[in-house]
Amino acid sequence: MTTAYTPMVQQYLEVKRQHDDELLFFRLGDFYEMFFEDALTASRELNITLTGRAGGMEEKIPMCGVPYHSVDNYIAKLIKKGYRIAICEQVEDPKAAKGIVERKVVKIITPGTVLSEQLLDDKHNRYLVFLQEDGSELCLAAADISTGECQWFSAAGEERLMAIQEQLFRIQPAELVAYSGIVNWENLAAWIKSKVPECAVSVYQEEEGAPQYFAQHFGSDDVADTLVHDTVEHLLRYLHVTVKADLSHINSLSRIAKEQFMNLDATAVRNLELIKNMRDGSKRGTLLDVLDFTSTSMGARKLRNWIECPLLDLSQIRSRQDAVGELLTNVQMRGNLQDKLKAIFDLERIVSRIEVGSANARDLVSLRSSLAVLPEIKSLLRYCNSKLLQQLCEDVHLHQELFTTLLAAIVDEPPFSVREGGMIRSGFDLELDELHSIASDNKTWMQNFELKIKEETGIKTLKVGYNKVFGYYIEVSKGQSANVPDYFVRKQTLVNAERYIVPELKDFENKILSAKEKIEQLEYYIFTQLREKIRSQIVQIQETARALANIDVLVSLAEVAFKYNYVCPELNNRSEIKIYDGRHPVVERLLEREIFVPNNTTLNNNDERMIIITGPNMAGKSTYMRQVALLVLMTQMGSFIPARQATICPVDKIFTRVGASDDLATGQSTFMVEMNEVAQILRYATKDSLIILDEVGRGTSTFDGMSIARAVMEFIHEKIKAKTLFATHYHQLIALEDVMNGVKNYSVAVKERGNDIVFLRRIVPGGTDRSYGVHVARLAGLPKKVIDRAQDILEEYDNCETACSVQITPRAEKETAPMGSLFASSLQQQILKMDVMAMTPIEALNTLYKLQDEAKREGGGL
């Protein structure tokens, strides 16, 4: 580093050398300045003026800056663009500095470690995820420092990557950090960027001798799985290195217990539009949108978690149902709870800001306001019959002493800054009151002093005043300036007056300014003491916050059931789903001029295990199948459902194959995307799963598609035995009802009126061999000439199909090829040598084509 630079620039370069991966915000007075390459980057990304600063060399160094009081807005913009920010503060008083002011980086802000309200969505968690691998085991640890939540998940064996991807998609991390050495890291990083585009991805290699934090946070190092311990430890180290603050609010570690929840992969979450819709990625038109009548930010986040993690245990589901049912019938209690919950601020994030030292007095007022309504909430819940509500009532702590202290200490509308006074109530601290008395008596003293000086000098027009630049002064007009006594010292000359100072006024000024400075110092000290008092109760406050979040969700579900006429589904362990007059919870809310047509559903492990649904496009097949999946999911999250009556068994997984489009990120065609999704279903579904398949095989030729569709159905029927809804335009497949036990045909009822059709939206028993595609084209407004020609061609195809119809016959096992066949042996050897698990879909497809070509050559074109 050259010594030709000024000391300040040398100091900057020394700090920057240690933070080469971050944009360095360097505090200079009231601004954060950026220099050199950082200045060029910040100027471009923030659209702020790029200037130059003399730095000791001939050419000025690039520089730009932002005001410290509005820095959060600028940081938010950079974080959203994926940058990391290092905040370098002045850590000593410039007045006391001997030479250049000491500065150091006090925190590093990354996408996963933000606490700024500008970057936090109050209804969504913001997770940092750390990923580590050891042999055949993958482990992730996730923390939201804005709420204090910390959890882990691990998976081993061939399915570990799939399991980790499912959790990553559910968590939707803001930042994913991988410990160096993960196999196939590049593929996983590409996957997360395609599924969660806003997630920042990086690789971490920690320094040797890093401190240990696990026991400090969780009280013990006692974790059976070494990889879990190490992954969580690395996560905590990363947080401490970046946040550089006390993180004691991260005090509870939980395992993501996959076996306790219904499994929903990324495809199911997307296709069912649980959290985001598929049109613009917003909340509108989603299940979350329909169910969200929460009153608190904590409740909104918890509701999302309940939707993403439906329960499997019948007793836990019933416990939630009982609570929702009681809140539904007790209208007055529900309304009162909603009113009280609306007064609750985001306690989880308030205590997090208190813990890391970024809270201000307004946060303490928000905490106080929240504590004020807790006695009324407990009173409302005290006599509930629901055991869950009783337990949640017990978990709400009153914190009465803390509330009383905050009420006495903090004014109702404190300033944003905690360093400039104005926070503490009069009467809370005797010393502070005395200082305020000195500072507030200045007007009376000035009036008396002015009268005294007028009498002493005989100048009746003089005035005693004050401004922030020159302090206190005596102002005398130009015409009277010759009459001032000798002890008047000129301080400022104006156009028509002179301003003076005298020793007595100067002494008073020092006394007042000293009092104001002491007030600011004492108020800040009192604030820090209050903060410490809150920190000592953080565990109890967090428990209260979690209880309030769960209460809020239960109240929300009861409100939805009341407003939309939902019923409580009966639970069974008979592997049976029977829904009477079920309705799609989202679609019925979006209909403005129509009444949603309800439908019945029966699925079981006996005579109606696989339902084939035929009928025209636009008639409601996809809506119906999604509806069934959503009602099952809502049941398992403890919600009531839109139906007249229902009895539903829990399912371990919901799989969906509904619609498809090209995946440009991985270079896959629509058909390849479809086949990949089907392959995942066939690999991971169990007999306790619910499978939704819509138009499997439509992305290829008719006979290829029909063959694939039938083969998939047979595999599910014979091998998996899962409950399945299968919509198809291949009406030839309806004949499977006659040759496969447990397969039933249903179709969408249609009423014909001449050349027109009316979709009745009713799912009725029996298949149909008509797709009504030409009728749909007519509804879409295609030219009459095109419609007429299409009808003629359709009749030709129908005649041909009648003559050359495909016969559905029971599946017969193929005879084994003769062992002496060199051709068969050759192919067999090639196939046995393949490492199928290491193949990409494209490689597998290419290999299949090669084998087919060889089979044609060796088999004489067969």
Language model regions located:
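Hydrophobic alpha-helical segments characteristic of transmembrane helices
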Residues: Q338-L341, V365-R368, Q542-N550, L554-A558
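Amphipathic heptad-repeat alpha-helical coiled-coil/stalk segments that mediate oligomerization
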Residues: E206-Y213, N263, L274, M278, ...
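Coiled-coil heptad-register positions
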Residues: R382-N385, P414, E450-I453, T457, ...
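ATPase nucleotide-binding head domains, primarily ABC-like/P-loop NTPase cores
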Residues: T2, F36-A39, D225, S295-T296, ...
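Terminal-proximal interaction/regulatory segments of ATP-powered molecular machines
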Residues: N467, D835-L862
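Charged catalytic and DNA/RNA-contacting regions of genome-maintenance
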Residues: M1-E326, G335, D339-K342, D346-E355, ...
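Active-site phosphate-binding and catalytic loops of NTP-dependent enzymes
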Residues: C88, P111-L120, D246, R382-L388, ...
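Extended, charged coiled-coil "arm/hinge" scaffolds of SMC/Rad50-like chromosome-maintenance ATPases
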Residues: L494, E498-E532
